[in-house]
Amino acid sequence: MGYSMWILLLVLSFARFAWATGDLVRLYEWSPGNTLAPIILPVKSGETPEQAATRYMRELQRQPELMELFEGRTPDLALSGFKPLNENSRESRALLIANLPKDYGMNSQRVINFKKIFAQSRHSSFILPMNANLGLSLEETRDLFKQISEKFPFMVAMGGDDVEPTLYKKQNTHSRNTIPTRDQFEIQLIKSYVAQEKGFLLGVCRGSQISAVALGYQLMQDVPFHVGDKVSHGNDWHEIQVHKTKHNILGSLVPNADGKLLVNSLHHQAVIYKENGPLQLAAQGHDGVTEATEFKNGRGLLLQFHPELMNNQLGSKILWRIVQQKNVVMPSRCSKIFAL
C-alpha cells in the first residue's frame, strides 16, 4: 500500500470515528486567506467542508435581514483552507462571535486587538460566523452549541448593533438597526454556553447587552432619554465606580482607594440590573447606568465599555485579567487527570 493511500485511509477512519461518537456535526477550521482568524464551520454528516461552506453561503443569501446588513453581497471567501478542529488544544482557544460584515475581513480593529492580546496569552482566536447554524436542523444546531461549549473554553460576544426589544418583551421605542434573526441565534448560543458551565463568557457593549438579555435581563433603550446627559455615553470617555464582587474580576484592577476607572464609551443603551439574578453588579457610571456585571459563578464578565479599543495599559490589563479568571475556572486537563 502506498503512503498516500495509507494517509487517505487514516483520514477516513478518523472521520468515521468522529461520526461514531454521536456528533451530528463536525467543527472545521476554515482559513480562506482573507480573514483575520479561522472561521469555525459546522459540517453535517455526509457533507464535505466545501459543501458545508457552500450551504452556509446559499442559506445566507436567503435571509433578507442578513443580506441587507451585507448590502446584498455575501462575504468573498474562497472554498479552501479547511481542516478539522484540533481536538488537543481546547484550553488555548478563544471564539469571537461575528455580528458585523467587517468581522469576515481583514480590517476589523476589534478582531485585530482581541487576537493580539489573546496571542500574547497563548490563545488562538477563531471567528464564529453570523447565524452559523444556517441550513442545520434543530438537533444539529443543539449539537453545534454543545460542541462549542465543549471545545471553546473562552467565548467573546462583541459590540455591534442594538438588540431587538421584543426578545426582552418590550416594544421598540429607541432601538436602531435591529436584526431579530441574528439576535435570536446569539441569544440561544449564549444560553446554551452559560448553561453548560464549561467555559468563560466575555461580553462587550452589545455583547454585554445581548448576554444579559439571554440571562433574563432587560435593556434601557436610550440612556440620554431615560437618565439625561449628565454622563456622555456616546463617543467619549468617563469614570466608572467599581464595586467589590464575589470574584472581584474588575475590582482587582482598581488602583485607587475610591474604586474608579476611566473607560471609553460607545453606546446609547445599557443593561437594567436587577437583584437575585445570575449577575452581580460590578461597576456603574456616576448617573447610575450599569457599566459592568460579573457572573456569580465566576464564569463571565459583561462590560459596557470596550477594553479592546482603549489602546492603553488599562485596556490590556482588563483583558489579561479576564484571561486569568478564565484559567481559574477552567482547570487544565492535566489537573483533571491527576485528580482522578
What does each model-found stretch correspond to?
Residues 301-305:
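Active-site-proximal beta-strand elements of phosphoester/diester hydrolases
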Residues 205:
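Catalytic nucleophile serine of serine hydrolases
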Residues 1-20:
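Classical Sec-dependent N-terminal signal peptides that target proteins to the secretory pathway
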Residues 209:
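Cytosolic ligand/metal-binding cores
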Residues 19-202, 213-220, 224-256, 260-262, ...:
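N-terminal beta1-alpha1 cap of cysteine-dependent amidohydrolase-like domains
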